């Protein structure tokens, strides 16, 4: 009977989302502050570093096309 009573009280008082984390004392754990930085990981520097890579890929395609043209001659 004790466990059923505790579950009922816990469910009534602490009714939150199903994915809410609770520690051993019954306190809710909010990980939003710790992991908010992970959602915005791409910086402007990283974007600038990616741009030359895209240009290199474009040039490699054109080099491949030139090789094919030279082979067909």
From Swiss-Prot:
A lipid is attached at residue 2 (N-myristoyl glycine). One of its GO terms (biological process) is viral budding from Golgi membrane. Its main location: virion. GO terms for cellular component: host cell Golgi membrane; host cell plasma membrane; membrane; viral tegument; virion membrane. Pfam families: U71 (PF17474). It is found in: Virion tegument; Virion membrane; Host cell membrane; Host Golgi apparatus membrane. Myristoylation and palmitoylation (probably on one or more of the nearby cysteines at the N-terminus) enable membrane-binding and Golgi apparatus-specific targeting and are essential for efficient packaging. Belongs to the herpesviridae cytoplasmic envelopment protein 3 family. Plays an important role in the cytoplasmic envelopment of tegument proteins and capsids during the assembly and egress processes. Also participates in viral entry at the fusion step probably by regulating the core fusion machinery. This is Cytoplasmic envelopment protein 3. The lineage of its organism: Viruses, Duplodnaviria, Heunggongvirae, Peploviricota, Herviviricetes.
């Amino acid at each position: 009977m004790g466990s059923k009573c505790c579950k009922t009280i816990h469910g009534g008082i602490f009714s939150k989302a199903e994915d809410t984390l609770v520690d051993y004392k019954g306190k809710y754990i909010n990980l939003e502050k710790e992991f908010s930085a992970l959602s915005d990981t791409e910086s402007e520097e990283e974007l600038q570093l990616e741009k030359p890579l895209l240009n290199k890929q474009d040039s490699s395609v054109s080099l491949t096309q030139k090789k094919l043209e030279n082979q067909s001659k």
